[in-house]
Amino acid sequence: MADEQLQLPPEQISVLRKAFDAFDREKSGSISTNMVEEILRLMGQPFNRRTLEELIDEVDADKSGRLEFDEFVTLAAKFIIEEDSEAMEKELREAFRLYDKEGNGYIPTSCLREILRELDEQLTSDELDMMIEEIDADGSGTVDFDEFMEMMTG
């Protein structure tokens, strides 16, 4: 359960703590599962009601109808992390499209070399060669979006 928490930055956990505390009116250390939807809505966090219900079921291990803070963070993190990764993929797709001038779904490794050099001017030619060799795993001399995405997200 704590895996998702590790992926959230401390400031995000702090925001979740404030929201949780505001809805934990009795200061019992837990909130009703009914309040989760309201908290996500107030935070401007998009969610699908059915997915939310399934996650509440999964996270509320003791089926108490209440979530402790850790359970709440685990649940909220699933929405936050998914949204962040979707946004990142969209941005990377746009960046890839800029370099894929012909629109054929790949960019030449020479273009990739320019991108890498812009990202880190300190790279030597040998380092660039090694990186490109690793990224262009199939040795095609081109990099498709999946290879590009893997490079950018590690």
Swiss-Prot record:
Keyword annotations from UniProtKB, A to Z: Allergen, Calcium, Metal-binding, Muscle protein, Repeat
GO molecular function: calcium ion binding
InterPro entries, sorted: CALM/Myosin/TropC-like (IPR050230), EF-hand-dom_pair (IPR011992), EF_Hand_1_Ca_BS (IPR018247), EF_hand_dom (IPR002048)
Residues at which Ca(2+) 1 binds: D60, D62, S64, R66, E71
Domain EF-hand span(s) in chain numbering: 11-46, 47-82, 87-122, 123-154
Residues annotated to bind Ca(2+) 2: D136, D138, S140, T142, E147
SUPFAM superfamilies linked: EF-hand (SSF47473)
Role, per record: Troponin is the central regulatory protein of striated muscle contraction. It consists of three components: Troponin-I (Tn-I) which is the inhibitor of actomyosin ATPase, Troponin-T (Tn-T) which contains the binding site for tropomyosin and Troponin-C (Tn-C). The binding of calcium to Tn-C abolishes the inhibitory action of Tn on actin filaments.
Family indicated by similarity: Belongs to the troponin C family.
Full protein name: Troponin C, isoallergen Bla g 6.0301
Species: Blattella germanica (German cockroach)
